[in-house]
């Protein structure tokens, strides 16, 4: 096992077959994304993304979905946490999550390629009813977004799903089967508990998800937390606790981010100005919209700077460790020479920790 952050990477994730499957996905996507942009497909819930340039930070909304990255790099900021996504990762969203997104590595020659598959929670519940999974204990609700390592078991059904784009007559029957397999693999994987908790009727996370869904549908209305607690059938303090555990923000903060995303979409799609978009999504003034948009950008920048600072601190700790080890081995070597001990101690220098050989969490 290789440790990467808090995740264990298995042999399946490191096997040459993973690289072969990524290559297959790149070739299949190239055939179905002739130009840059988001490409909806004939398969319900599946969208292919092809981006050819880095982007500034922008607010976005993730629905319950699985986003598999095939090439390029993207940075997702969620409540001050930064998730770096590349060809070895997938991003799982188990609820509606407002994020700040930024493409950080993409070009004409090496575009960012990713597949987004929306998750049908009814299908998740159906699979849970047919198979035995460890029930979520509900003691520590997980965040509504998580990053994981792509495996052979996950990439294979995606390859077969893209094959259906060349056999449209098979899509109505086979696409449902393949999507069920993908959901099954997710439920069996390290991030499966997130989906199980959201989908389990009566679970606190499931009740909180109902409140989140209501907010998503009614974000333009004034927020009454008492009404939200009634919808979730929870006490107000309990709702606040579980809401923050899933989204890392309060219901009011969540509503603000929903409005920011909706306003941006109106400006891009409908071509309206910022003031009109702000009023349409529930802001009382354009200045309020501008303030919150600036705050969102600064929060995303702070999250990125915090992650960079952690990497710098880790590098500084590694340098200090190298100095200590170097001094220690020189001392041992001198003692060995003075006492006529075997020359093997002199070879300790060759075993000093070298830059780049580390497994520190960045």
Q: Where on the chain are the PLM-derived regions?
A:
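A short, N-terminal "cap"/entry segment at the start of jelly-roll beta-barrel domains
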Residues: 1-42, 47, 55-56, 138-143, ...
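Amphipathic alpha-helical segments enriched in hydrophobic/aromatic residues interleaved with Lys/Arg
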Residues: 5-25, 124-181, 185-186, 193, ...
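N-terminal regulatory/effector-sensing and dimerization cores
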Residues: 38-135, 320
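Residue at a beta-strand N-cap/secondary-structure junction
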Residues: 75, 222, 271-272
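Short alpha-helical segment immediately N-terminal to, or the first helix within
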Residues: 214-218, 265-269
């Amino acid at each position: 096992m290789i440790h990467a952050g808090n995740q264990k990477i298995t042999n399946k994730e490191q096997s040459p077959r993973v690289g072969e499957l990524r290559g297959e996905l790149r070739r299949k996507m190239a055939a179905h994304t002739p130009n840059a942009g988001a490409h909806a497909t004939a398969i319900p819930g599946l969208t292919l993304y092809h981006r050819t340039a880095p982007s500034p930070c922008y607010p976005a909304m993730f629905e319950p979905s699985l986003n598999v990255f095939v090439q390029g790099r993207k940075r997702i900021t969620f409540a001050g946490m930064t998730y770096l996504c590349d060809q070895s990762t997938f991003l799982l969203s188990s609820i509606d999550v407002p994020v700040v997104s930024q493409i950080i590595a993409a070009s004409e020659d090496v575009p960012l390629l990713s597949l987004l598959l929306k998750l049908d929670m009814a299908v998740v519940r159906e699979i849970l009813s047919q198979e035995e999974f460890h029930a979520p204990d509900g003691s520590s609700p997980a965040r509504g977004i998580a990053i994981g390592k792509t495996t052979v078991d996950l990439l294979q059904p995606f390859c077969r799903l893209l094959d259906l784009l060349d056999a449209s007559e098979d899509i109505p029957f086979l696409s449902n089967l393949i999507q069920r397999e993908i959901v099954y693999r997710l439920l069996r994987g390290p991030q499966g508990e997130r989906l199980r908790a959201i989908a389990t009727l009566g679970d606190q996370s499931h009740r909180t998800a109902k409140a989140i869904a209501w907010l998503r549908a009614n974000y333009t209305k004034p927020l009454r937390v008492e009404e939200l607690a009634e919808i979730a059938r929870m006490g107000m303090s309990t709702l606040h606790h579980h809401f923050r555990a899933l989204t890392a923000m309060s219901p009011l903060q969540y509503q603000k981010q929903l409005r920011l995303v909706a306003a941006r979409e109106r400006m891009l799609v409908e071509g309206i100005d910022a003031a009109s978009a702000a009023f349409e999504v529930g802001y009382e003034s354009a200045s309020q919209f501008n303030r919150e948009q600036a705050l969102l950008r600064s929060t995303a920048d702070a999250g990125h700077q915090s992650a960079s600072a952690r990497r710098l601190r880790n590098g500084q700790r590694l340098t200090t460790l190298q100095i200590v080890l170097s001094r220690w081995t020189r001392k041992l070597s001198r003692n060995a020479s003075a006492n006529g001990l075997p020359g093997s101690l002199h070879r300790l220098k060759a075993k000093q920790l070298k830059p780049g050989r580390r497994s520190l969490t960045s």
